[in-house]
Amino acid sequence: MDIREILKVLPHRYPFLLVDRVLEADERRFKALKNVTFNEPHFQGHFPGHPVMPGVLILEAMAQAAVGALVRQPGFPQGGLAFLAGVEGARFRRPVYPGDTLILEGELLAFRRGVGKVAVRALVEGEERASATLTFVLQGAS
């Protein structure tokens, strides 16, 4: 999925759109890319002189990437939304810096009755920087 296709399935927009490209996605697995740049507004205050991507934004990028698999589920309504409902076992192993290419990859663990659970990892140059299990609730289009 390129950015045009991503904009069709994610409601997020600047400065909160945190996925630049979905590299691979099927009903079970996904892999997406986020180019981390110093031009992003959070780097002005997190932290001056030592910019580090906030962990909560790494989690948000992971959640946005997971939608690549969720929208392919038979029960996902066209125009529907996936809301983050839970975060389990979040771990932040190393910082993410401006200039890094963040690879967000994961696997759908379960999907039933409009609720999905996904295991996600965030990597830079093959090294895991963060991981979590995320739960989503799907809401149909109105």
Curated annotation (Swiss-Prot):
Enzyme Commission (EC) number: 4.2.1.59
PANTHER family noted in UniProt: 3-HYDROXYACYL-[ACYL-CARRIER-PROTEIN] DEHYDRATASE
Descriptive protein name: 3-hydroxyacyl-[acyl-carrier-protein] dehydratase FabZ
Chief subcellular location: cytoplasm
Compartments where found: Cytoplasm
GO molecular function: (3R)-hydroxyacyl-[acyl-carrier-protein] dehydratase activity
Cellular component terms (Gene Ontology): cytoplasm; membrane
Tagged with keyword Membrane: no
GO terms classed as biological process: fatty acid biosynthetic process; lipid A biosynthetic process
Domain of life of the organism encoding this protein: Bacteria
